[in-house]
């Protein structure tokens, strides 16, 4: 298994640090030849429009779309989850490049601005009974799940904050900003 972390923008360093802590040496993916070397890819939080545009500039949108969910497991956190969604609400004017690989509808910045960021416990039975610490920074919200896409994580109010579709995983929160590595370990099993 070879794990890559998309390193164009956002908090890729934090994901790399967690992977190293659990014994995995990641490849920082910035170019198509690096993407071709990995079978697991983390798309980090950051700014989804910027990451999408950089994926287009560096000609990685189509290779990721082609391989995503087949021979490439993908996990998108926050902005990465937006990029994975096949429907994005509240896009910037003019739209934004996305991968559209997961059958889910997501709303950008659903909880408000940077000042409205928060932490809350997450129920995620797929990784264990103990609640997961959730860090939400300008977080999107999963509004609807389509065929083949299942909810795997919830806030106390029932809001879906994690979804899985085969080898694709989307989280609207930032596990890489906590000391809990269970979601990273789950991703490695996809």
Swiss-Prot record:
PROSITE patterns for this protein: PDXT_SNO_2
GO MF term set: glutaminase activity; pyridoxal 5'-phosphate synthase (glutamine hydrolysing) activity
SUPFAM superfamilies linked to this entry: Class I glutamine amidotransferase-like
Alphabetical keyword list: Glutamine amidotransferase, Hydrolase, Lyase, Pyridoxal phosphate
Example GO BP: pyridoxine metabolic process
InterPro entries: Class_I_gatase-like, PdxT/SNO
EC number: 4.3.3.6, 3.5.1.2
Keyword Transport applies: no
Pathway annotation: Cofactor biosynthesis; pyridoxal 5'-phosphate biosynthesis
Active-site positions on this chain: 78, 174, 176
Any one Gene Ontology cellular component term annotated for this protein: glutaminase complex
Binding-site residues, L-glutamine: 46-48, 108, 137-138
Transmembrane helix is among the record's keywords: no
Highest taxon of the lineage: Bacteria
Function per UniProt: Catalyzes the hydrolysis of glutamine to glutamate and ammonia as part of the biosynthesis of pyridoxal 5'-phosphate. The resulting ammonia molecule is channeled to the active site of PdxS.
PANTHER family attached to this UniProt entry: PYRIDOXAL 5'-PHOSPHATE SYNTHASE SUBUNIT SNO, PYRIDOXAL 5'-PHOSPHATE SYNTHASE SUBUNIT SNO1-RELATED
Assembly behavior: In the presence of PdxS, forms a dodecamer of heterodimers. Only shows activity in the heterodimer.
Family of the protein in this entry: Belongs to the glutaminase PdxT/SNO family.
Name of the molecule in the record: Pyridoxal 5'-phosphate synthase subunit PdxT
Organism: Chloroflexus aggregans (strain MD-66 / DSM 9485)
Lineage: Bacteria, Bacillati, Chloroflexota, Chloroflexia, Chloroflexales
Gene name of this polypeptide: pdxT
């Amino acid at each position: 298994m070879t794990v890559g972390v998309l390193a164009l923008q956002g908090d890729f360093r934090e994901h790399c640090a967690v992977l190293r802590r659990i014994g995995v040496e990641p490849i920082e993916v910035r170019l198509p030849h690096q993407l071709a070397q990995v079978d697991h890819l983390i798309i980090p939080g950051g700014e989804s429009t910027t990451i999408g545009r950089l994926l287009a500039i560096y000609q990685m949108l189509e290779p990721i779309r082609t391989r995503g969910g087949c021979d490439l497991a993908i996990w998108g956190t926050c902005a990465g989850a937006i990029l994975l969604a096949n429907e994005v609400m509240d896009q910037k004017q003019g739209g934004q490049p996305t991968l559209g690989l997961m059958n889910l509808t997501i709303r950008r910045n659903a909880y408000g601005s940077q000042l409205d960021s928060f932490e809350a416990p997450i129920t995620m039975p797929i990784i264990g009974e103990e609640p997961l610490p959730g860090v939400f920074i300008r977080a999107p919200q999963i509004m609807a799940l389509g065929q083949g896409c299942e909810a795997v994580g919830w806030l106390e109010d029932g809001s879906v904050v994690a979804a899985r579709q085969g080898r694709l995983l989307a989280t609207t929160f930032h596990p890489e900003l906590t000391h809990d590595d269970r979601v990273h370990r789950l991703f490695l099993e996809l």
